[in-house]
Amino acid sequence: MITVPHSRKVELDEIDRAILRLLQEDGRMSYSEISRRINVPESTVRARVNRLVKEGVIRKFAALINPFKAGYEIVAFIAVDAEPAKVKQVVEELAKFPEVDVLGIVTGAHDIFMQVTVKDLQELERFILEKMAKIDGIKSTETSILTSVKKWGYARVF
């Protein structure tokens, strides 16, 4: 589980940021290509990437998949209201479901917010009425379905 707001902040210099920007552009870019583009030795790039992984700045290297092209028609955002004493327990249970892409405790009108990706409306219904319904502590949910995508990004490096 990621605990971003309360994690120790890692100091990033311009070389770190340049490496991160290039890896976000193309996660398969070789260290030698990164080295060439930012004009530092390849050994520096390798050491920096290893440090960024070790310190948790780079969580993992993965392909960014377009869910719609991969046969998943529904991306939904679900706000959850939970019993105050059970919020953390509810989050731990929700985190176990493969349908959940992003999950966190939030401020505002709801306690928990998540993004889920499923193949169709029937699978979304099963997720809410069968899987989520079994979790003790959930009081109510509010679901919004993404109808179009204007931007699908990832964490920016300034």
Curated annotation (Swiss-Prot):
Domain of life, source organism: Archaea
Gene3D superfamilies: 3.30.70.920, Winged helix-like DNA-binding domain superfamily/Winged helix DNA-binding domain
Keywords carried by this UniProt record: DNA-binding, Transcription, Transcription regulation
Record-level Gene Ontology MF annotations: identical protein binding; sequence-specific DNA binding
Example of a GO biological process term: response to amino acid
DNA-binding region: 31-50
Alphabetized InterPro entries for the sequence: ArsR-like_HTH, AsnC-type_HTH_dom, Dimeric_a/b-barrel, Tscrpt_reg_AsnC-like, Tscrpt_reg_AsnC/Lrp_C, WH-like_DNA-bd_sf, WH_DNA-bd_sf
A Pfam family reported for this protein in Swiss-Prot or TrEMBL: AsnC_trans_reg
Sequence ranges assigned to domain HTH asnC-type in this UniProt record: 12-73
Entry GO terms, CC: cytosol
Name of the protein described by the UniProt record: Uncharacterized HTH-type transcriptional regulator PH0140
Organism of derivation: Pyrococcus horikoshii (strain ATCC 700860 / DSM 12428 / JCM 9974 / NBRC 100139 / OT-3)
Lineage: Archaea, Methanobacteriati, Methanobacteriota, Thermococci, Thermococcales
